[in-house]
Amino acid sequence: PGYPDLVGFGRRDMTVSPEEAAADLAYQVGALWAIARAEGVTLRHVKPHGALYNRAARDRALALALAHAVRALDLGLVLVGLAGSAMEQAAREAGIALAGEAFADRAYNSDGSLVSRSRPGSVIEDVATVARRAVSIARDGSVETYDGGRINLAAHTICVHGDTEQAAQIARAVREAVVAAGIRPEPLWKIV
């Protein structure tokens, strides 16, 4: 679920109250749940998208509203949010499971936030670099920052974006590198 921003693919920040965002999340997840059920599959997790995700990572009121909306749906869904962000505390307060997420293909600021996509180097597209970062996140719980430092990340899941030119190759390389490092990928609902 994300902001109602079709033209900007949900990546533009919008002025929406926490209550409106929670209602949008409930509507979007409810629709997706119905589609999944009609197709005979089970919806297991929910992840806010784009600007909504980024705002919820730093806006406690929004994070809490989204977490309560997920809880109110009563579908047993795992909420996915940026590791170390306001989403973690919000999920705890709402009494729902949260999968802390890290990004192997995005640059981090030293405070754990993602570097704005408007900055050069914010999206990492080199296959080997992304795979190496994924292993560092999964095995060591840390990643290099935009300014060359390191931050710790307690992540349950690693995201790679599907809209980069080599997305499929990156995803394969990440899985192969993580498995080669002795880490066995598991479904979120089994580990959170």
Predicted regions and their residues:
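Glycine-rich tight-turn/loop motif centered on a GG-T
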Residues: 7-22, 75, 113-125
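Flexible, glycine/charged-enriched surface loops at secondary-structure junctions
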Residues: 36-44, 142-152, 182-191
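Charged helix-capping and loop-helix junction motifs
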Residues: 59-65
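Glycine/small-residue-rich loop that forms an oxyanion/phosphate-binding "nest" at active or ligand-binding sites
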Residues: 5-48, 55
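Structural preference for beta-strand elements that scaffold enzyme active sites
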Residues: 43-47, 76-80, 97-99, 157-159, ...
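Catalytic beta/alpha-barrel core
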Residues: 21, 55-58, 73-83
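C-terminal domain-boundary segment and adjacent tail
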Residues: 77, 169-192
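Active-site rim beta-loop-alpha module in soluble metabolic enzymes
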Residues: 84-142
